[in-house]
Amino acid sequence: MRILQLSDTHNQHTRLTELPEADVVVHCGDFTENGTEEEVLDFLNWFAGLPYPHKLFVTGNHDLCLWDAEGIEDLPDGMHFLQDRGCVIDGVRFFGLAYNHPESLIPDGVDVLLTHEPPVMLLDKSAGTHWGNAPLRRRVLEVKPRYHLFGHVHEAWGVMKMEDVVFSNGALADNCNRLCRQPRLFAL
């Protein structure tokens, strides 16, 4: 299974025109800039039109109008809003934790975890400060998903492996919210 990671596109998603082939595309939040309903609808229409059989997304700190949403009605087949919930695709267990929600919601047995926030001290440093979430780090290292995909801290874009977990900060934007990086592709 090939998984394409997007994150932190801040209303610039339509500029992503040459995306690689994948089985699943995930967006780790901050698909909007101001979190308005209009911005969310624009993103959802674009995301639904991508040529991938499975599309998964979680909210980020900019996606304000969806922070408390429990779901989104009438999503196309294969598109999942993983707001504190999971789905299974070809035997692979995905789970998405909404921005700033408690890490205790992450169940055991997850293969691919999507969050917006990074775990503390792992691809989370900006301007000399670590912005990650310490309880999230503890829970991720308990659950040990094969992949933990996130964004949020634009300057900390990168991949690292720790205790058999691949951590990926897939933020595509720079500090001025301009797209400056290519999406990352993983093979599972």
Question: What is the predicted role of each segment?
Answer:
Residues 10, 28-41, 152, 156:
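Di-metal (Zn2+ and/or Mg2+/Mn2+) metal-binding site signature of metallo-dependent hydrolases
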Residues 19-20, 107:
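A short, aliphatic-rich alpha-helical micro-motif
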Residues 23, 30, 53, 111, ...:
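Conserved acidic residues
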